[in-house]
Amino acid sequence: MRQKITIFVVTDQDSPALLKCGIVLYILIMKSRKRSFQKNVLNHCYQRTADGGVIFYSNLDYLVWFTIVCATARKRKVRILAMCPMPDHTHFSIEAASSSELAAFMRDYSSLFVLEHNKICHRKGPLFDTPFGSAPKYSDKMVRTNLIYVWNNPPERKLIGKSEDYRWTFLAYAVSDHPFSKKLVVRNSRWPVQKAVKEIMTQFNAGRHLPYALLKRLYEPLTADEKQQLTDFIISTYNVIDYNAALKYFNSYEDLLLAVHSTTGSEHDIKESFVGKTDKDYSAMVRILLRELQPKDIHDILALPQEEKYELFLLLRRLTYAKTEQIAKFLHLAVKRN
């Protein structure tokens, strides 16, 4: 949350007492801006875009993001208990040895993802708002509440009925390496699948993420079922989420699901703002534009001039139930109200 601070200018011509008060006030302000942190205490980290716009338009967006996060987490030796990318923001429940290590992880992963994102979306400049939001969770109850809150983001935004049924909470991967597809038996698979698995393992073993160009090439010759299998394989291979650490707060996976289903969790330390009744509107807009415009890639739409984006804005306003602000967020378009 941004705070409005009133600054009093005190000079050496003022009384010594007033000058001393000014110095104390400055110190208090600077301390208040320092990130609250405690070693190996779980932190809820939150990111949104600088312009409030959408981040994720396709499954490839989520996969690029996920593999970058996991590769960076291994290098920075942070422990992730939960994470959930939402269409226009991201959540992490994460432990780190120091505040600088946490900041380094967020910086490194964000920088790499922004490079990939900007390239595919034909844009320049920063993507995420800075600094990222974070709030430490000092008690077991606070940790449980936060984990539930992160996992329940998709149901709360009506993307799914149950958290574990939504691939991008990664909850289902706690008990299965292929929760959304048939088990992949590589030796019995078609050559394009075998080739894809080999290239993915080469990237993974080298500590590298999966870039857009590689993923687009690997997915292009696959059937719908094979794409689901490969997605499960990628997530299970790269996954760094410490499910055992998370389960300690719930005793078992069954108890975890019971807690997630019975309460939404809460977050009082980080202020989130939501637009519209459901985030399903964003995927609906993707389907409409793919049908109406038939672009080679949905991201190409983001490179259109503002005038053409405004024409799409009018189209989407006519064909969807999305709010004006949601359509503007989707197109990264500034819409003036009369």
What are these regions (language model features)?
Residues 1-82, 96-338:
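Short Pro-Cys-Gly-centered "Cys-loop" motif that presents a nucleophilic cysteine in a tight turn
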Residues 89-97:
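Short beta-strand->loop micro-motif that forms the acidic, two-metal-ion catalytic signature
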